[in-house]
Amino acid sequence: MATKPKLHYPNGRGRMESVRWVLAAAGVEFDEEFLETKEQLQKLQDGNHLLFQQVPMVEIDGMKLVQTRSILHYIADKHHLFGKDLKERTLIDMYVEGTLDLLELLIMHPFLKPDDQQKEVANMAQKAIIRYFPVFEKVLRGHGQRFLVGNQLSLADIILLQTILALEEKIPNILSAFPHLQEYTVKISNIPTIKKFLEPGSKKKPPPDDIYVRTVYNIFMP
């Protein structure tokens, strides 16, 4: 039996959550080793397990992969979530890169000063509604298909759904002006592997709380 991938990261969303999403969508079971102390990170660094001294790190297929996008590409390619040809791969990559720019605002939000957090929610909403969501609404309206690229599930769909659902936690009506994205979100959420990941008891992490923020500061701050 093949060894399960092992994810090394604190017990929270951060940059590892996209990796969890893609593995889950692919139907791949995985283990996690949560970082809780600076000493655990130091041990990984001293053991030459982290190419650039940073996490996320995923042990998979005899490798220790780092750099979030590289990890996502490897898993997506392995599990046929990265298009059928170069053109599709490039489209998927463009969509993913754009969505990850938006997702990064969500990842960093809990580490802002309290006075700045509400302002940043407004900023995220504005960017989503003006810059990002119109792109995907136009794509879905234009080709009339269920998925963004190639009429099959891809990394682009997974990362977009992750980002939409995370935004809806803060701004429930964020999709009110985007009917195609509303329908798309429901359809992708009901793909069996994704539906299972969205159910209680899965390895999907909850929104970051004060405990997660303190843990991250304790591990990574000098």
From Swiss-Prot:
InterPro entries: Glutathione-S-Trfase_C-like, Glutathione-S-Trfase_C_sf, Glutathione_S-Trfase_N, GST_alpha, GST_C, GST_superfamily, Thioredoxin-like_sf
GO molecular function: glutathione transferase activity
Chain residues that bind glutathione: Y9, Q54, V55, Q67, T68
Span of domain GST C-terminal: 85-208
Keywords, alphabetical: Acetylation, Cytoplasm, Transferase
GO CC field: cytoplasm
Function: Conjugation of reduced glutathione to a wide number of exogenous and endogenous hydrophobic electrophiles.
Family: Belongs to the GST superfamily. Alpha family.
Assembly: Homodimer.
Protein name: Glutathione S-transferase A4
Organism name: Bos taurus
Lineage: Eukaryota, Metazoa, Chordata, Craniata, Vertebrata
